[in-house]
Amino acid sequence: MEHPAPPVAAYDVEAVRKDFPILSRTVYGKPLVYLDNGASAQKPQLVIDTVAHAYSNEYANVHRGLHFLSNAATEAYEQAREKVRRFLNAPSVDNIIFTKSSTEAINTVAYGYGMPKLGEGDEIVISIMEHHSNIVPWHFIRERQGAKLVWAPVDDDGAFHIEDFVKCLTERTKLIAITHMSNALGTVVPVKEICRIARERGIPVLVDGSQGAVHMPVDVQDIDCDWYVMTGHKLYGPSGIGVLYGKTGRLKEMRPFMGGGEMIEEVTEDRVTYNDPPHRFEAGTPPIVQAIGLGYALDYMEKVGREAIRAHEASLTAYARERLSSVNSLRVFGDAPGKGSIFSFEIAGIHAHDVSMVIDRAGIAVRAGTHCAQPLLKRFGVTSTCRASFGLYNTRAEVDALADALEHARKFFA
């Protein structure tokens, strides 16, 4: 299948790389080639400095004090919420809930909406490509409520076909939970079309944007999803911060996932009433500095240019497809049109862990294992693969280094 590389204009990747201090280090005496962005991305100096400044100059708990530091921290925290709102083009900051991760965000919907709304025989449609974080919470509902999971397939190229998805929908379908972009294959799912079809049938849709939000602009109003989740550490921000976007009506339907401070309106000896969203879903002290750091990470992505990032990564993906095809005995899993910058692969006869360890000695960081996507790997008949995932700072020279190291690994185990 031909995938011509799109032209990339005015993208200075070397200037971008200088913003990430860790990229200047060496590993085993070799320059670091970091290709594990699908697991977690590196942080620009802006984010590192922001986190240090917040702890050094304006740290206090938020929404709980009238003193100077509390007001400063609250203002910075809520400014981060506004930055997330703009990043997703959400209608209001009240649609933006801070969590600790995408995983917690999905569980918030599963427990807050799925548990009270779904019952015996109701169906939840997910795809075979889902990360375990978008599988296991729905299994909880299957086990406790008697709901059923229905799996939308992919073809042998890892492509997602809308006509196959529609066949999964029945009068018992009560929820759709779907990835925006596969973390193992890079397949991009037509979530806007899915939401259009779902809307006609009155089915709510959760989109897992843990990968999608990193690699393409996202407009939740245009997609028209009911919920959208993403995680900060993949967006070049700190770990420990995630985001749940929810439509106003859906958030008001949901019961709180956790109880504690801030999420209440009133507590008495015999009853409790809950705060309005988003605070209803932010029990306890939130990830304050992590949220502030995420806001500045999104600022950084906007500065570089989200369309420019997408074009750079598309060009890199096309080049990687070409270079990896030159490695003898290497099989790439997933070649869907328009795929994102993720490559899962194996070298015939060599375990993924062994390949990863050998190329690590060349300074190259990839992931080896199941990528928290065991049903997908089973569908392709493998138990583990290596995964190279590219970000806004990766280069063609690093793709060359990967291809050369893989050829060396193949010969090493021959």
What does each model-identified segment do?
Residues 1-414:
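Pyridoxal 5′-phosphate
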